[in-house]
């Protein structure tokens, strides 16, 4: 069990690093977008979800699970980007 937990801890650390990079891109997007309404882009959301679904299918990962996780991640990202948009224009 110790090895399993160590493996999970390693994956979690990598995920935190990758999510930090992802949110850095959200910060950049918030600075680039011309207005707050541009932050929520339903076409882009659908595109990301489709790419994740394709990657999950290719890698043999549970597609429904990935869809749920990414739905939450995208909504959290949008909220973060809106906050960053507001902060940079205050």
Regions flagged by a language model, labelled:
Residues 1-90:
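Domain-level signature for soluble enzymes in the chorismate/prephenate branch of the shikimate pathway
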